[in-house]
Amino acid sequence: MSVKIQQISPGDLTLYASVSIAFEARSVYRVETREQGLGGLLLVEELVDPYIKDYDAQAEGNDRPNQWAQQFDLRQWGFLMAMDGERAAGGAAVVMNSPEVHMLENRSDLAVLWDMRVQPEQRGKGIGRRLFQHAAEWARVKGCT
């Protein structure tokens, strides 16, 4: 079945949250400075014993998608779902014009990809790339650069 990307409303965040964000990590990255920072920074990858990283399981308070409305005004947010028939295959959340999100610097021409997730059994099929492309287009249409 072909996967279709569609926009959903904040009322559908329970469906969005049903997509697992957990993944297996096999390395960590460490920042090294060169010449006390004057020579730049180097990102060094270190292999570690594999472990499961699950941001939803680590989330506190209102950090899970189905709780975002308790912390943020979602009227200017864009929510995209990748649907494989009736099954949620992935999702992306894009934020703009949200004063609570300080990285936007109260500018109306900026957007940020807040969250992106793809079901584990759907990974490696290009769904994340398609969600990213749709998220970028959503922001462009809204006037973000």
Locate predicted features.
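Conserved acetyl-CoA-binding loop-helix of GNAT-fold acetyltransferases
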Residues: V118, G124-E137, V141
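Active-site rim helix/loop that mediates acceptor-substrate recognition in acyltransferases
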Residues: T33-F79
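Conserved beta-strand in the GNAT
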Residues: M81, R87-M96, V112, R117
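Short acidic/polar active-site loop segments enriched in Thr and Asp
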Residues: T145
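Conserved N-terminal entry element of GNAT/NAT acetyltransferase domains
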Residues: M1-P50
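Conserved donor-binding loop and adjoining core beta-sheet/short helix segment
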Residues: V31-L43, D84, V94-D109
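Conserved acetyl-CoA binding element of GNAT-fold acetyltransferases
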Residues: L104-P120
